[in-house]
């Protein structure tokens, strides 16, 4: 059995409610099991970006399309165009009824360069969601 260490994490009440719903819906035995699973997936998805090798992948970002965010994303596109193979964009309405922009990048190149690009995306103000998938 794996040696497990206990830590403490604080969440807003609304997020705990959502976590509890996922635990019940997906059949997890506890919040801890769900959170361990989520952290494990995060580490696995991001770990290939720490190696210095050629990889391919997809980066998804959903954000509030403010002037500042649109300008920042445009700047990032030009700064990192050597790893961007294609880009698909759409304006959508979120489940909360807010307007958002979705950008899906297909990327290929040195994992360190892709990591730098993704780290900049993570800093976008008004970001609703982001994800990187490396294969």
Swiss-Prot record:
GO biological process: regulation of DNA-templated transcription
Disulphide bridges: none
Domain of life: Archaea
InterPro entries: Acetolactate_synth/TF_NikR_C, ACT-like_dom_sf, Arc_rbn_hlx_hlx, CopG, CopG/NikR_regulator, Ribbon_hlx_hlx, TF_NikR_Ni-bd_C
GO molecular function list: DNA binding
Pfam families according to UniProt: NikR_C (PF08753), RHH_1 (PF01402)
Protein keywords: DNA-binding, Transcription, Transcription regulation
Span of the signal peptide: none
PANTHER family the UniProt entry points to: NICKEL-RESPONSIVE REGULATOR
UniProt family annotation: Belongs to the transcriptional regulatory CopG/NikR family.
Protein name: Uncharacterized transcriptional regulator MJ0767
Annotated source species: Methanocaldococcus jannaschii (strain ATCC 43067 / DSM 2661 / JAL-1 / JCM 10045 / NBRC 100440)
């Amino acid at each position: 059995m794996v040696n497990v260490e206990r830590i403490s994490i604080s969440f807003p009440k609304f997020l705990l409610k959502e976590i509890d719903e996922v635990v019940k819906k997906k059949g997890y035995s506890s919040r801890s099991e769900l959170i361990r699973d989520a952290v494990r997936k995060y580490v696995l998805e991001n770990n290939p970006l720490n190696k210095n090798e050629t990889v391919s992948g997809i980066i998804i970002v959903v954000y509030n399309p403010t002037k500042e965010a649109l300008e920042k994303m445009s700047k990032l596109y030009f700064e990192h165009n050597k790893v961007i193979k294609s880009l698909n964009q759409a304006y959508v309405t979120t489940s909360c009824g807010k307007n958002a922009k979705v950008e899906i990048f297909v990327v290929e190149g040195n994992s360190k360069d892709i990591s730098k690009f993704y780290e900049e995306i993570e800093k976008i103000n008004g970001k609703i969601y982001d994800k990187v998938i490396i294969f």
